[in-house]
Amino acid sequence: MRCLGKRAETIFRKLIEGLNEPGDHRKIDNTGGTFMPVSIDVLGVERKTIEGREWYEMTVSLAHNYVQNGDLMADPDVEFCATPLGVAPLSFQQDPGIYRRWAWQENGQWRFHPRGQADLAMFCNQWMVNIKQQQFDTAQRTFFPAPTTEETEA
């Protein structure tokens, strides 16, 4: 299965920094509406010990979303599997009506469509670079803006 390249993986891991449990999420919008915000959701985490080493598989969704006629639309929504060894894209959704699952688990083993999953990984390598270019706050050198006064007082 094809993983993200090093540059894209670094960006991905920065985006999910601090998100560790199912249900953890964040929205990054540093452009004031110029570009679509990025929504990040932890869908699941499986932790186990293999040969005395801690191991995890974290399933994460990264998405650009918009509302059309009251419905939340994906533009796109990509599901990833992150492990200590790398980050691999699993599925792609683009509304209206496009959904492709290129990698899945079957009886505890990973199965994947080689060409489709590799194409998705290539797309995601560029998408991570685009997200960084669009959402990285160069003044603060972070994806995450400083908390507002209201956030620090709460």
Which residues does each PLM region occupy?
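Short intrinsically disordered terminal tails
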Residues: 1, 148-154
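N-terminal "first-domain core" detector
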Residues: 1-36
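Non-membrane alpha-helical secondary structure
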Residues: 4-7, 32, 54, 112, ...
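Generic hydrophobic, helix-prone segments enriched in Leu/Val/Ile
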Residues: 5-8, 40, 62, 126-127
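Amphipathic, interaction-prone secondary-structure segments
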Residues: 27-83
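An exposed acidic His-Trp-rich patch
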Residues: 72-142, 154
